[in-house]
Amino acid sequence: NVQLWSRNALEWTGKIPEIRDAVAALGLTSAALDGELIAGAGTKEDFNLLQATLSGERQGVLTYALFDLLHLDGVDVADAPLLERKALLQSVLEGQGRPLAFSSHVQGDGDEAYRVAGEQHFEGIISKRADRSYHSGRSEDWRKTKQLASDEFAVVGYTAPKGSRTGFGSLLLAKPDPEHGWLYVGRVGSGFNDELM
């Protein structure tokens, strides 16, 4: 009896039967696994494709990238160090392929891992203390470091406000293009409060 839950305590078992069936095929008596659902051809997250796939708008390839094991066949392993839990998880997933994937790790040089993540266009890295027990939610034992990219854009327009928002909905952005004058690059609407508007 496999149940899949989001980090916001939303029950997703019926939305992703291919993941449910793959976890059931592991043949475990009982387990609590922690991971991230990824949509796309590789192992890099495409959040927009994930949302569209879960809503039924698109048919993305889903992968459940597993990075922790908290309970296995009647034994609570959440208090064991992270590296022990990951070794157990890797043994559980041995020989398994998509849609399940073991989320590998790098020990040591965080700066190098961050650089490689940037080269591969990943969102960033998660750094965890290898000797620590599991804690749900954020803690001092792990950090998320995102890749930061910046550029300069011109505001070329805006959309009308919706709901209780006043002023504008979002700002339309463009950058100079030698062939076409201006090239639309997207919109931004977060970060503005009523006082700024």
Which positions does each model-derived feature cover?
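Catalytic cores of nucleic-acid ligases and guanylyltransferases
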Residues: 1-197
